[in-house]
Curated annotation (Swiss-Prot):
Effect the entry attributes to changing residue 121 to I: Abolishes GTP binding
UniProt-recorded Gene Ontology molecular function terms: GTP binding; GTPase activity; SNARE binding
Chain ranges for the short sequence motif Effector region as given in the UniProt record: 37-45
A Pfam family hit: Ras
Keyword Membrane assigned: yes
Effect of residue 205 to S: Abolishes membrane association. Lethal
Posttranslational modification: Prenylation is required for interaction with GDI1 and YIP1.
Protein name, UniProt field: GTP-binding protein YPT1
Amino acid sequence: MNSEYDYLFKLLLIGNSGVGKSCLLLRFSDDTYTNDYISTIGVDFKIKTVELDGKTVKLQIWDTAGQERFRTITSSYYRGSHGIIIVYDVTDQESFNGVKMWLQEIDRYATSTVLKLLVGNKCDLKDKRVVEYDVAKEFADANKMPFLETSALDSTNVEDAFLTMARQIKESMSQQNLNETTQKKEDKGNVNLKGQSLTNTGGGCC
């Protein structure tokens, strides 16, 4: 294990173009915000190290372009991702409607064990909101994924979103390791029993 960190998690940010994925990542990684952020072309990424439950977790966060013409480029990044954050804009109904399509993309390209988080960005724009919290929460619950509303502008829940994702992955990995350890012990017990049986059977042979 690397001495600089205990875990390395690969996260993916997906969602329609213009929902604020890059601004969320910039706020989380550098604690800055800009209105002049240029739309991502293809894929960009940043690295952020955080402390989580006494462990050092290195997050490799990939920011993908939402435009259709980049879809084939970004699809390859689904594989190998531990967690995928689907972002929509609370002031843009179409971006929320698009979440279903993004979930289909995850089913198509990601592993079956990948973890998901739904994020409604731009919650600071209260007067322009068109997607209600309860509607999005119900959708997230139906699809068995956590849900948070964020604002890259004023930092609301931005850190919580990434840490929620990281914690999910860490807990999933811990459970997986526990299951594997239990399975190995069971397998070892079976091997010993079989070995003993074979030894006894062959005891009279020269």
